[in-house]
Amino acid sequence: MKSPKKYLKFLLFKPLQLPFALCVRLIHFFTQQHQKLNRHQFLKVLFLATLVICLLFGQVVSAQTQNASLLVEQGIKDYDAGNFPNAVKHWQEALNQYKNNPSDAAVVNENLARVYQQLGQNKEAIESLSAAIRDYGAVGNIQQVGRMQSELAQVYSNLGQPRKAIALLCGKLVDKSKSSENQPSQEIKCTPESAEQIATKYNDKRGQVAALGILGEAYRLIGSYDQAIKYLDTAQQVSPESKFLVFNSLGNAYKSRGQLRELQADSANKAGIFSKEKEFTKKSQEDYDRAYQYFQDSIKFARNEKQPLAEMRGLLNLIQLGSQTNQSKFINDGEFNTTIKDALEVLEELPDSATKVYGAIDLAYLQHDAKGTSPFTYCPTGLVLSGDNEALNLLENSVLTSKKLQDNRLISFSNGALGHFWECSPDNEKALKNEKALKYTQAAIIAADSKLSAKDSLYLWEWQAGRILDKQNRQEEAIASYQRAFDTLEDIRQDILTAERDVQFDFRDVVRPLYRTLAQSRLDLLGVGAIADEGRAKELSKVVNTIDALKLAELQNYFGNDCILSGLNPKQVGELLEDNSVAFKNTGFLSSIILDGKTGILLQLPNQATKFKWIEDPNQQGDKVVSSDTLQKKIAEFRTGLVKREEINYDTTIASQLYDWIIRPFAEDIKPEKVKTLVFIQDGFLRSIPMAALYDSKLNKYLVETYAVATTPSLRLNTPKLRDRSTQKALILGLTKEATIDGKTFEQLFAVPDEVSAVESIFPNHTPLIDDNFLAESFQQTLDKTTYPIVHIASHAQFGIIPEDTFIVTGKNQKLTISQLENSLRNLNSKSDSVELLTLTACETAVGDDRATLGLAGVALQVGVKTAIASLWSVTDQSTSELVKTFYTNYRNTGMSIAEALQTAQIRMIHAKKLPPSEGVNPMYDHPAYWAPMVAIGNWL
């Protein structure tokens, strides 16, 4: 083989030294950070959280076969000049000549992978890297196989698929559910064929640092911050080279962990565990201190090694840490302003690159007291660069730079950012600015859609276009744009939402408003009569599908993995109602939807058109629509009155008012002779109340006296079916003792012994695990041995605002986390082994906390059971035992549905004062505080 005149040495770990080897910052979904209450940055810091190795492992490489060497050499020149399309053309031609030469084909595929990444063509990059791995393996170059696996892992990680990255880098994933604050994650030895082990075996220090660095970053992206820090610490010990990259990633890892601990402190505060709040707050501040120091060190080392791109990343990370609320103490005003000045100076000197484009956008949208979410989802205020068109100039320059680079991904982000600037400009010359905003936004859409170069941002620009069109009073075009944004987001949502929940983008600021905007826009068109009568049903069906998708996304976001959607029915809600019209013939479905300032109710009945009504108060002066704030206050007041149960004779005033607002408008449609069961699919704060306790003042009846009542997060998640109840084996778990978990005392449940005895008497074939015998380990071992269709848990179950604070109290002051419960139940061997019914009789959810009740609503689906019977709040009284006993008797011995079995049990307690003493039911149990909190979730048949 004849070497080309210019042979470019393979450079493993210094990709920043030459222009053509600059790292492409592939924007992905999980590099965002959060502030309190899941405040994650989404596309705000467009490249700050740079992977530890920008693993274009250096430079494009020359192949050395005589006939193709000139093509390879020409491709290198094209690449070096930034003419990436021509580089692809020449290298593809060379590759065709290397079909029977795997050694040189591997080199060309390696080069193609890098240029495809420059062009934002990730699918092609993955194919080329996979081919390079195959070819290097064929010729026995195992060290290079390891390096290519690391590079492929980085691409997957950048695309929001860090678990695939971990599989390539190590082969095994640390199980977070088997670790805790006091029990660190187990040590994992990577498999022999993994990138990390290949590098170790061949003493490839640079390859080892690369694998460890990307591995650490991947663990950061799935929320395993302790594991991330461990790998990154190891990376800096293996080799002293390019510490600025490792330090930058360590800074991001500590910052992410600090934000998680800040979130946990807030959750502890809401749960009343103030000692834990103090502990998490202290740890959070310590992590922020470390992040600050690592960013400083990263900047210092980058300057010493004359690496302006790395210096830029460090500066912007430091600026963002300083601009976030509650972080200002780390950087005083003087240092903050100096750092911005330094960043602007470095930006000016950078060569044209992705870093220069994203850096300009970040600086342009830099805010004082940043919200921590994407600046493209709202109009930012308090821009730091607010004078002399500084921000505008940066954005316009970013557009010019992206065009020079011919990178559709960069073109998309730069035009989208500039379009958003004009969208948010003051109202003077409004028409002209809207035209400019739309022009640049449409350019962003075209670029993002070109070979799916930036599909992860396409929905942002479609959404942005919809908002601009709305301003121009082009409502139908706006809705079409919102719909395209929705469709794109639905397509990529699985990747966005399947990381651990604490590392996802800010769901509340990104997904939720888009879905609600689309639904409200369609309803507004219906309200003004813009849709003909024959089209109303179709439009309402679209609204239903949009809101259903939102509720699915909320659940996936809360639990942070894709298991909850494993049984998702691909059909839309209307199709499911039609397919199951016989099973659902006596069932009405009421879906609530909270929109801008008002709340609506959708009624669906099999084989009938969907109906919609805003919640209204006929006694209200002027506009009859009840504001969402008013409704939320009324809901909180209703629940508080139930939980406190201060009065022996319950005052039904609020319950009656809510009935009149929510149920009565549909009275003619849900007459009891036609509808026997009402299934509620609730939104937001409406999840926190038991609908069974609403009161019909005209009939002097609670809702549950007329209808069986159930709730489900979505019909698509667990389409109800009649189940075989012939197998009556029960696993009964209970805790009778007082327990202390994380500084919070859970009082003794005096009624649990009676409750357990009652369940044992109904299910003779049972296994009890009580008090110290009820532990996570014994629970798992028992399930491994025997199938139990029924699992009854009589212990405190706390549902927090994050899954980490969702657990069941077990013996020995320990807890069974929702993740452990899920793993235990999902590890059952087959569908025939699955749990049909999970009962939790002492659940606690925070008042007014819709995220906690979201956890309760999704628990059955999350842990893989068909139905959950659970309480909205704990009732420390014999009433639970009475209710459960009647429910199980009905469930086992009659042909009642699950909802009807619960209904009958609740009606029995409502009539407690009328029952003879021989029944043994305390007359005070007629108060809804005792029977209303138990709800049926999931399959109600």
List the predicted regions and their residue ranges.
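N-terminal secretory signal peptides that target proteins for export/translocation
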Residues: M1-R39
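Non-membrane alpha-helical segments in proteins
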Residues: S69-D80, D104-Q118, R147-N158, G213-E217
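An often Trp-containing, charged/polar helix-loop segment at the C-terminal end
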Residues: T880-L941
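N-terminal leader/linker segments that initiate helical-solenoid repeat arrays
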Residues: C54-N111
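Bacterial N-terminal signal peptides
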Residues: L46-L56
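Alpha-helical solenoid repeat scaffolds used for protein-protein interaction
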Residues: C170, K176-S179, Q183, Y225-Q227, ...
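Catalytic-core domains of enzymes
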Residues: D562, Q572, A583, I681-I790, ...
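Catalytic cores of nucleophile-dependent amide-cleaving enzymes
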Residues: T711-L715, K721, P789, I793-E882, ...
